[in-house]
Structure formats: structure tokens, C-alpha cells
Amino acid sequence: MITQFEFNKRGGVGTISVTANIAPKLCSEFQKNSTSKNDENLAKAKELDDILQPVHTAMFVESNPSPVKYAAKLMNLCDDEVRLPLVKVTEETKIIIKKAIESAKLI
């Protein structure tokens, strides 16, 4: 699987990111550094990518937008209500999301 870091490092530009809804600063900093040709910036981008990967993964354990809504709830940004046919994330997924956003120091 090619990550956003690898895509940008190979000359790709831009991203579509669910994670940016809950980690806009990290995602913005990652994007800025990962599109640089400077080795120092690319090293910083790799560090940020390592921080963000568990969050990216957690946002797709269940159907979007339920995981990001739950993460936003943990961050006191909104509630985790979703409309049918969507459902809230399971208790198992809540644990995965919480661990991921804690590891990224978002809460």
C-alpha cells in the first residue's frame, strides 16, 4: 500500500483526508513538509506520517463518518450522532479510535 507520504515524496500533490477533520494542524504540517525536496522537511514529514498512520487507520475501521464523529466527540468538538442508515461505532472501535488519537496527542 502506498501511503500519502510515499505519494507526495514521488511527486504527488494534494490529499483527501478524513483525518484532517480532527487533526488539521498535523495534516497541514505533514502536507507542507512532504511536498518539499528538502531532506530535513522530508524527515519531519516521515515523523508526522508515523504519528498520523494509526489515526488514518482508525478512521476507517468502520464506515465514514462514524469514526471521525466519535473522535471529534472525544475532542469535545461535537457529538457522535449520525443519521440512519449510518450507526455509531461499536465499543470495540471506540477503543481503537481512542488509542489512536491519544497516541497522536490529540486528546
Describe the role of every protein-language-model region.
Residues I2-T3:
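Short acidic active-site motifs
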Residues E6-I107:
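Structured C-terminal cap/extension of enzyme domains
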